């Protein structure tokens, strides 16, 4: 029996929202099918933070590992989706406490009723204390359906610094609009980009049974 899949990755295209000043997605055709050419070949340019992505420690730590040198285990396995819809600007412990019993090692928080298709300067982020408590419970990956686990205006990146210190991994820009609260299998592997500070992922959830 085939287990149901939920695609939790947004479409990546020229209109995909990016942090102000970041590199948007663009594509050009280097070759097209026609006389003397049997294939279409394109070149793409984008920030690795466009769409669903995994941050590497290098993104928030000058001496951190690049995404191509990060262990993959955290990005694959049992996961819990917790709803904190409309909560913010920070997701506090009280917003997720109803669903933290017997947590698996991966937690994704849904804050949007419907994910926006344009940049959201007022995005919801994790409160650093929430990340600390999740780490205390053995969580090794956190994710969110906004562009960052820190507020868009943050210069200190307090929640990123918690995951640096506690050794957690992170997924951002997920789409959880159609996902009920509960437990799933997460599959969200980053590319082996040897020197990059992040990587796009094709994030999916799979039913446990």
Curated annotation (Swiss-Prot):
Binding residue positions for substrate: 19
Cofactor: Zn(2+)
EC number: 3.5.1.9
Pathway annotation: Amino-acid degradation; L-tryptophan degradation via kynurenine pathway; L-kynurenine from L-tryptophan: step 2/2
SUPFAM superfamilies named in the record: Putative cyclase (SSF102198)
Reactions it catalyzes: N-formyl-L-kynurenine + H2O = L-kynurenine + formate + H(+)
Molecular functions per Gene Ontology: arylformamidase activity; formamidase activity; zinc ion binding
Residues holding Zn(2+) 1: 49, 53, 55, 172
Role, per record: Catalyzes the hydrolysis of N-formyl-L-kynurenine to L-kynurenine, the second step in the kynurenine pathway of tryptophan degradation.
Subunit relationships: Homodimer.
Name of the molecule in the record: Kynurenine formamidase
Source species of the chain: Delftia acidovorans (strain DSM 14801 / SPH-1)
This protein's encoding gene: kynB
């Amino acid at each position: 029996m085939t287990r149901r899949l939920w695609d939790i990755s947004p479409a990546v295209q020229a209109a995909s929202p990016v942090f102000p000043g970041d590199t948007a997605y663009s594509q050009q055709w280097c070759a097209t099918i026609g006389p003397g050419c049997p294939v279409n070949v394109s070149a793409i340019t984008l920030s690795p933070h466009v769409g669903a992505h995994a941050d590497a420690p290098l993104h928030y730590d000058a001496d951190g590992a690049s995404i191509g040198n990060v262990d993959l285990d955290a990005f694959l396995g049992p996961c819990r989706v917790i709803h904190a819809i409309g909560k913010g600007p920070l997701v506090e412990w009280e917003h997720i406490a109803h669903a933290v019993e017997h947590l698996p090692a991966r937690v994704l928080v849904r804050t949007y009723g419907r994910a926006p298709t344009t940049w959201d300067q007022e995005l919801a982020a994790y409160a650093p204390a929430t990340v600390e408590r999740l780490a205390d419970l053995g969580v090794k990956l956190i994710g969110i359906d906004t562009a960052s686990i820190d507020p868009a205006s943050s210069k200190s990146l307090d929640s990123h610094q918690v995951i640096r210190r506690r050794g957690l991994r992170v997924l951002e820009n997920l789409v959880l609009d159609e996902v009920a609260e509960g437990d799933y299998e997460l599959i969200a592997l980053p590319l082996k980009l040897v020197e990059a500070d992040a990587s796009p992922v094709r994030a999916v959830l799979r039913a446990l049974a």
